[in-house]
């Protein structure tokens, strides 16, 4: 079974990577899909984020990385995926993600959403927090993959 793990991943964090790795143990193929979010001003281009994620997932043989503009369910149909993979950190994530899961089913009844609870060590972690810490010169090496930490440090230097 194919699962899509969609997100803006700006930047990808160790929490995201944990969901990807665990999803890879559950599904035949996990396609990490970098989406363009018109409501966010990105740190890195979509192409750069795809490159970053490919580098930090190269050890996972059943993970692909792609990008897409449009509705996630349309991309899932295109890739013959029946599952959207989502990570949950806190209760507010669940409320938002459950609403989105129900909305997606109204768009295509062939899609299911599988939620994975984030590992406790990443329950506080978000891309926004990483950017905030890096912007003020704090260490982010324990929050993002090494290649991404280097890119972010370069960006803010």
From Swiss-Prot:
Cofactor(s) the record lists: Mg(2+)
Question: What positions does the entry give for substrate binding?
Answer: 8, 40, 72, 86
Binding annotation for ATP: 8-9, 16, 87-89, 97, 122-128
This one is known as Phosphopantetheine adenylyltransferase
The first-level EC class reads: transferase
Q: Which GO terms describe its cellular component?
A: cytoplasm
Question: Where are the residues marked Transition state stabilizer as a site?
Answer: 16
Function according to Swiss-Prot or TrEMBL: Reversibly transfers an adenylyl group from ATP to 4'-phosphopantetheine, yielding dephospho-CoA (dPCoA) and pyrophosphate.
**Keyword Lyase attributed:** no
Similarity comment: Belongs to the bacterial CoaD family.
**Which Pfam families does its entry note?**
CTP_transf_like (PF01467)
What pathway does the UniProt record associate with this protein? Cofactor biosynthesis; coenzyme A biosynthesis; CoA from (R)-pantothenate: step 4/5
Q: Which GO terms describe its biological process?
A: coenzyme A biosynthetic process
Write out the entry's keywords from A to Z: ATP-binding, Coenzyme A biosynthesis, Cytoplasm, Magnesium, Nucleotide-binding, Nucleotidyltransferase, Transferase
